[in-house]
A protein has these predicted regions:
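A short acidic, Gly/Pro-enriched loop at the edge of an enzyme's catalytic core
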Residues: 129-146
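Residues lining the SAM
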Residues: 148-152
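Class I S-adenosyl-L-methionine
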Residues: 185-229
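A short, conserved alpha-helix within the catalytic core of class I
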Residues: 154-169
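Class I SAM-dependent methyltransferase Rossmann-like catalytic core
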Residues: 1-30, 40-48, 60-71, 76
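Conserved beta-strand signature within the Rossmann-like core of class I S-adenosyl-L-methionine
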Residues: 166-183
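Class I S-adenosyl-L-methionine-dependent methyltransferase module
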Residues: 47, 51-125
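A conserved beta-strand element that flanks and buttresses the S-adenosyl-L-methionine
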Residues: 146-147, 178
């Protein structure tokens, strides 16, 4: 991964709770966050004494490098949002500027925690479908894996085979996998959702789409749950 190809954009614990329908009991579980990037989910959960391990290839870079990239990409991202306001639901955030300020605060919370968390093994520079599943922390099963803004969202860039292989790997290390959102970047439903659901249903797993209490990308208010017996 090259840092100049990354667009860091982090989300908060409150957003994770809404995106993934996370109950208080579920927040006490051992959780794997896949594709967390500069989200403050891990930092906020750690403050509460909870257990989260985040994996993302961006963690190969230092806090200063990530902060610099955030500064480089912030204005282009907000400009793009302002050019396409009809793609979004302006309820949680008043407008693009309010969105931007919330994102900056979230990413700064992540950055303040990052180096300490990385040293503690909470931030791992790994990527799907090549997790080091034979080694800690993956040698002990996670109760829940949440995958935010990666699978399905980038269906134009990531193949169906990639999705199947990646989800298979997540299910090797977690009892349950939740994926949000189910839309692509253009706000259309991913064409991979149906074959992915069919694949895991045929394998005897519990598979369902759930509506969640979060919608920013218009129509993006559903997650996929896959649960092992």
């Amino acid at each position: 991964m090259k840092l100049n190809e990354v667009v860091p954009w982090g989300r908060s614990l409150a957003e994770y709770r809404a995106m993934f329908n996370l109950s208080e009991a579920e927040l006490r579980q051992r959780i794997l966050g896949c594709g967390d990037g500069p989200a403050s989910f891990n930092a906020e959960m750690t403050e509460r004494g909870r257990s989260v391990v985040s994996v993302d290839p961006i963690y190969q870079f230092s806090a200063d490098q990530i902060r610099q990239r955030v500064q480089q990409t912030y204005e282009p991202i907000i400009s793009q949002v302002k050019q396409n306001p009809d793609r979004y639901v302006w309820q949680t955030f008043r407008d693009a500027d309010a969105l931007g300020q919330a994102r900056l605060a979230t990413m700064e919370k992540f950055l303040q925690d990052y180096e300490v968390g990385k040293a503690a093994g909470r931030y791992l520079a790994q990527s799907l479908p090549n997790l080091a599943i034979a080694h800690p922390p993956f040698d002990q099963p996670f109760e829940l894996c949440v995958c935010s803004h990666l699978l399905f969202l980038y269906s134009d860039q990531l193949s169906l085979e990639f999705h199947i292989t990646a989800i298979d790997q997540l299910l090797q290390v977690a009892q349950e996998v939740r994926i949000f959102p189910l839309l692509q970047l253009d706000c259309r439903l991913s064409p991979y959702l149906e074959p992915v659901m069919q694949d895991w249903s045929d394998k005897g797993l519990e598979v369902e789409v759930q509506t969640v209490a979060y919608e920013f990308q218009k129509g993006g208010n559903q997650m996929l749950r896959i649960v092992k017996d």
